From Swiss-Prot:
Compartments where located: Mitochondrion inner membrane
Pfam family, one: Cytochrome_B
Organism expressing this protein natively: Colius leucocephalus (White-headed mousebird)
Gene Ontology MF term list: metal ion binding; ubiquinol-cytochrome-c reductase activity
Membrane topology per record: Multi-pass membrane protein
Entry's cofactor comment: Binds 2 heme b groups non-covalently.
CDD domains per record: cytochrome_b_C, Cytochrome_b_N
Note: Heme 1 (or BL or b562) is low-potential and absorbs at about 562 nm, and heme 2 (or BH or b566) is high-potential and absorbs at about 566 nm.
Protein name (database record): Cytochrome b
Gene name of this polypeptide: MT-CYB
Length: 380
């Protein structure tokens, strides 16, 4: 009998083992769809980004008008730009759901997969930040100035570090050029790390909502989950196209319709919505270095998840106290996001500080305590 090419060809064999004959737990829910959605987001962003880069000029005098030119004069340039800008928002929606799912169902116990995932999140955040600077509007310029300035909080080498990042004594042409270079490079790096992420995942196999070993009961990925993923794609592409076609500027900042002007500071400098929770944590500490450390810790704390897992059960499915804490953490993140979008004045300052303390307290103190308590209650 002739060998099955899908299973014998060196390249097709890899595809087959990852996407077709991959043994998958039969009970994984829709929360497991976000990984494939992130893959689609990455492909969409790379494709639309390449088309935008073909018409973009990385020069302070031309960047703003080159983006306007793309939207006005290039065939479907407006659509490509709107899909790219809003695609970033969907990328973050998917990654936050994906992380939340991993946190809820104890997927962080696959340490290598989890750690590469956190590195992917950091890379995505860096990519989105440098990308936001490229249209060279007011918020692009001042966002770049404020965030890169944070490096000056590093003791001893801070100022040198900032000037090295800027390529001069302020955010200017060299900064824009290198940010464009980084924005072009990073998505391909993300694609590479994604392959490492998947390699580690396929070493152990997927987790499932019950958090139990499912080796004795698995089904092939295709056609069951390939079809389920296609449903996920449609359900994501629908709101993305709706947003890009009906209200493309809904999530953007009106300040970015004004070309960058180093002499005029916008009344309220704030990042895109997906960074607001971290921005609120940064602002809630009056000390510059302290704020920078808290900002870094707000994301790097994810690396500690496997170490803080004290429960004898993997998932939160049968742990109502942990579930309550999880949803409190979610609500707290929404509060931080809202506070980050508000001006720095009386009620918002104290709300931000309380929400920041609560954020770290829930993750670092309350979760391990509740997990230990649940073990005692279940007589483990």
């Amino acid at each position: 009998m002739a060998p099955n090419l899908r299973k014998s060809h060196p390249l097709l064999k890899m595809v087959n083992n990852s996407l077709i004959d991959l043994p998958t737990p039969p009970n994984i829910s829709a929360w497991w769809n976000f990984g494939s959605l992130l893959g689609i987001c990455l492909l969409t962003q790379i494709l639309t980004g390449l088309l935008l880069a073909a018409h973009y000029t990385a020069d302070t005098t031309l960047a703003f008008s080159s983006v306007a030119h793309t939207c006005r004069n290039v065939q479907y340039g407006w659509l490509i730009r709107n899909l790219h800008a809003n695609g970033a928002s969907f990328f973050f929606i998917c990654i936050y759901f994906h992380i939340g799912r991993g946190f809820y169902y104890g997927s962080y116990l696959y340490k290598e997969t989890w750690n590469t995932g956190v590195i992917l999140l950091l890379s995505l955040m860096a990519t989105a930040f440098v990308g936001y600077v490229l249209p060279w509007g007011q918020m692009s310029f001042w966002g770049a100035t404020v965030i890169t300035n944070l490096f000056s909080a590093v003791p001893y080498i801070g100022q040198t570090l900032v000037e090295w990042a800027w390529g001069g004594f302020s955010v200017d042409n060299p900064t824009l050029t290198r940010f464009f270079t980084l924005h072009f490079l990073l998505p391909f790096m993300i694609a590479g790390i994604t392959l490492i992420h998947l390699t580690f995942l396929h070493e152990s196999g997927s987790n499932n909502p019950l958090g139990i070993v499912s080796n004795c009961d698995k089904i092939p990925f295709h056609p069951y989950f390939s079809l389920k993923d296609i449903l996920g794609f449609t359900l994501m592409i629908l709101p993305l196209t709706t947003l890009a076609l009906f209200s493309p500027n809904l999530l953007g900042d009106p300040e970015n319709f004004t070309p960058a002007n180093p002499l005029v500071t916008p009344p309220h400098i704030k990042p895109e919505w997906y960074f607001l929770f971290a921005y609120a944590i940064l602002r809630s500490i009056p000390n510059k270095l302290g704020g920078v450390l808290a900002l870094a810790a707000s994301v790097l704390v994810l690396f500690l998840c496997p170490l803080l897992h004290k429960s004898k059960q993997r998932t939160m499915t049968f742990r109502p106290l942990s579930q309550l804490l999880f949803w409190l953490l979610t609500a707290n993140l929404f509060i931080l996001t809202w506070v980050g979008s508000q001006p720095v004045e009386h009620p918002f300052i104290i709300i931000g500080q309380l929400a920041s303390i609560t954020y770290f307290m829930i993750i670092l103190i309350l979760f391990p305590l509740i997990r230990t308590l649940e073990n005692k209650m279940l007589k483990y």
